[in-house]
Amino acid sequence: ISGMSGRKASGSSPTSPINANKVENEDAFLEEVAEEKPHVKPYFTKTILDMDVVEGSAARFDCKVEGYPDPEVMWFKDDNPVKESRHFQIDYDEEGNCSLTISEVCGDDDAKYTCKAVNSLGEATCTAELLVETMGKEGEGEGEGEEDEEEEEE
């Protein structure tokens, strides 16, 4: 019995390199298919829009970008790069949907915002203004939960 198992083991070893080559060929085939996708410079299919927001609430700019290779997305506030923080949240998914969410908007956030998409073929930008409405009295409009009421109706 041990002699038979030895033969089976030696008999199966020549097939392993063939299988390994087959897998490598499949990987190469998949890479070739991916490379056939046409290269396109970035362009926006949905651009960000001007927005009026009450101080203390949240603001969100949404856009959608296409392009191949997948563009790198950067956000700017008055031409200065926006760094992600508790105040600025940046999202970008595989579908090309981009968003910049500004929590607890204050007077300093009243500015021009730009989304810039860049790949090896070029770049595209879209720009919008955020107008912050400040309340007359201190403390008004600070209530939580007011932020999302209008956005829910999409």
Curated annotation (Swiss-Prot):
Ranges where the Ig-like C2-type domain occurs: 42-133
Keyword annotations: Calmodulin-binding, Immunoglobulin domain
Single GO term (MF): calmodulin binding
Keyword Ribonucleoprotein attached: no
Sequence ranges of Polar residues compositional bias: 10-19
A Pfam family the protein falls into: I-set
Region of interest (Disordered), residue spans: 1-24, 134-154
Stored Gene3D superfamilies: Immunoglobulins
Record-level GO BP terms: tonic smooth muscle contraction
SMART domains for this protein: IG (SM00409), IGc2 (SM00408)
Species: Meleagris gallopavo (Wild turkey)
Family: Belongs to the protein kinase superfamily. CAMK Ser/Thr protein kinase family.
Protein name in UniProt: Telokin
InterPro entries, alphabetized: Ig-like_dom, Ig-like_dom_sf, Ig-like_fold, Ig_I-set, Ig_sub, Ig_sub2
Transmembrane segments: none
Subunit architecture: Binds calmodulin.
Biological function: Corresponds to the C-terminus of smooth muscle myosin light chain kinase.
CDD domains: IgI_telokin-like
The keyword Metal-binding appears for this protein: no
Highest taxon of the lineage: Eukaryota
One GO cellular component term noted in the UniProt record for this chain: stress fiber
Composition bias, Acidic residues: 141-154
